């Protein structure tokens, strides 16, 4: 089977209408509901609204550029879950894991052939 190219239909975030004009209006998206709203009525030249057409391909959704999906790992036993799925998932160590446990997780992943996306994070070299 041929590999499917990962295509993101939109990478820019959808901004809230008039968030560039007023400081009190945040940038996070809100659906316009006013009866005279130009954005809701989809006038030409206004910002675009999120809709179903911007969705990505189901087979490549949530994929990283290397083609793997991230799986959050909090302990060594979570790495063992990826043993049979190391071609589709990559381990990503959670941010609240200590440096000592990180070393154990990375060693276990290397033994099982599981890729770790943030293997070098928070791990200091022996001085």
UniProtKB/Swiss-Prot annotation:
<keyword id="KW-0687">Ribonucleoprotein</keyword>
<dbReference type="InterPro" id="IPR018263">
    <property type="entry name" value="Ribosomal_eL32_CS"/>
</dbReference>
<comment type="subunit">
    <text>Component of the large ribosomal subunit (LSU). Mature yeast ribosomes consist of a small (40S) and a large (60S) subunit. The 40S small subunit contains 1 molecule of ribosomal RNA (18S rRNA) and at least 33 different proteins. The large 60S subunit contains 3 rRNA molecules (25S, 5.8S and 5S rRNA) and at least 46 different proteins.</text>
</comment>
<dbReference type="GO" id="GO:0022625">
    <property type="term" value="C:cytosolic large ribosomal subunit"/>
</dbReference>
<dbReference type="GO" id="GO:0030684">
    <property type="term" value="C:preribosome"/>
</dbReference>
<keyword id="KW-0689">Ribosomal protein</keyword>
<protein>
    <recommendedName>
        <fullName>Large ribosomal subunit protein eL32B</fullName>
    </recommendedName>
</protein>
<dbReference type="GO" id="GO:0005829">
    <property type="term" value="C:cytosol"/>
</dbReference>
<dbReference type="GO" id="GO:0005730">
    <property type="term" value="C:nucleolus"/>
</dbReference>
<dbReference type="GO" id="GO:0003735">
    <property type="term" value="F:structural constituent of ribosome"/>
</dbReference>
<dbReference type="GO" id="GO:0002181">
    <property type="term" value="P:cytoplasmic translation"/>
</dbReference>
<dbReference type="InterPro" id="IPR036351">
    <property type="entry name" value="Ribosomal_eL32_sf"/>
</dbReference>
<dbReference type="InterPro" id="IPR001515">
    <property type="entry name" value="Ribosomal_eL32"/>
</dbReference>
<comment type="similarity">
    <text>Belongs to the eukaryotic ribosomal protein eL32 family.</text>
</comment>
<dbReference type="Pfam" id="PF01655">
    <property type="entry name" value="Ribosomal_L32e"/>
</dbReference>
<comment type="function">
    <text>Component of the ribosome, a large ribonucleoprotein complex responsible for the synthesis of proteins in the cell. The small ribosomal subunit (SSU) binds messenger RNAs (mRNAs) and translates the encoded message by selecting cognate aminoacyl-transfer RNA (tRNA) molecules. The large subunit (LSU) contains the ribosomal catalytic site termed the peptidyl transferase center (PTC), which catalyzes the formation of peptide bonds, thereby polymerizing the amino acids delivered by tRNAs into a polypeptide chain.</text>
</comment>
<keyword id="KW-0539">Nucleus</keyword>
<keyword id="KW-0963">Cytoplasm</keyword>
